[in-house]
Amino acid sequence: MTDYLLLFVGTVLVNNFVLVKFLGLCPFMGVSKKLETAMGMGLATTFVMTLASICAWLIDTWILIPLDLIYLRTLAFILVIAVVVQFTEMVVRKTSPALYRLLGIFLPLITTNCAVLGVALLNINLGHNFLQSALYGFSAAVGFSLVMVLFAAIRERLAVADVPAPFRGNAIALITAGLMSLAFMGFSGLVKL
């Protein structure tokens, strides 16, 4: 049980996909201008990363390894992610049309989010079992969502703050992301993996 707790805390805080592994930077910078959009994108990404992680493990374990098709792993995972994203897009369109309009082009772009493919490939490379794969996918997504929501809240405050002209816009956003990364480095002594 403590192994699963350490995996969760370690993935969310210590080995955060955005701030430590630099995966998922495109939606991190692109969708984080408004808190509402960041929360919606975080929920959609959490659903996709968790489901894609589970599906990728199942396909790798039951199809690719037994048939000795490991060289098709990346292609198979990309196809799995595309199917999961299309399913998510249909669910969001039916359940929340307002969120669907807010997310716009970023919802189909989850397919190309390198964090989603990264979590599927890292699960296999780290040798996780089914439960660990599901938890790793979920905790990576929670870490991604946490950082994106925090960053969106900070960016909303910075939009009305008195920021010097050369630092307005993306410059202050990158400085803020760097400071967040430094803050998350403080968690590195918390968990020894």
Swiss-Prot record:
Pfam family of the protein (one): Rnf-Nqr
Transmembrane segments: 5-25, 47-67, 72-92, 102-122, 134-154, 171-191
Leader sequence segment: none
Record keywords, A-Z: Cell inner membrane, Cell membrane, Electron transport, Membrane, Translocase, Transmembrane, Transmembrane helix, Transport
Gene Ontology BP annotations: electron transport chain
Entry GO terms, CC: plasma membrane
Entry keyword annotation includes Glycoprotein: no
Location(s), subcellular: Cell inner membrane
Catalytic class of the enzyme: translocase
EC assignment: 7.-.-.-
Keyword Disulfide bond attributed: no
Membrane topology: Multi-pass membrane protein
Physiological role: Part of a membrane-bound complex that couples electron transfer with translocation of ions across the membrane.
Family: Belongs to the NqrDE/RnfAE family.
Subunit composition and interactions: The complex is composed of six subunits: RnfA, RnfB, RnfC, RnfD, RnfE and RnfG.
Protein name: Ion-translocating oxidoreductase complex subunit A
Species in which this protein is naturally found: Citrobacter koseri (strain ATCC BAA-895 / CDC 4225-83 / SGSC4696)
Lineage: Bacteria, Pseudomonadati, Pseudomonadota, Gammaproteobacteria, Enterobacterales
Gene: rnfA
